[in-house]
């Protein structure tokens, strides 16, 4: 099979937080799907998302997504390759970040508190597990 016939790689995302930023992530990925595919040579698909209130109206389409109130369900989902953490704080968010990294899932976070207070631990855990930890926008990005 030559390059033109290969199916495009789909990177599956688990999203923690469906507030303003989380809903925007979904909208941007949906709206820019073709441009992202052309630029990256792969597709990104949010397959599961976590929110405190699943009944709250969202400013994005949640069609086809698995929805949960349990952030660990997102991290433990076997198909999730990248965890995007947008819940903030240093309690459950930190637990989720560490577990995601230890389960060999790449992580992107906008969690200023977790990076400020536990950045060295998170970076060290990511390095030991050969995992990408993205957080630039969380710190004066």
Per-segment meaning from a language model:
Residues 10, 22, 135, 140-141:
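A broadly tuned preference for mixed-charge, low-complexity surface segments
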Residues 106-108:
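A short hydrophobic/small-residue beta-strand
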Residues 2-103:
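N-terminal glycine-/serine-/threonine-rich beta1-alpha1-beta2 phosphate-ribose binding loop
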Residues 1-2, 116:
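Short intrinsically disordered, low-complexity coil segments enriched in acidic
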Residues 17, 110-111:
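A secondary-structure boundary/capping signal
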Residues 94-99, 112-140:
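Rossmann-fold NAD(P)-binding glycine/threonine-rich loop
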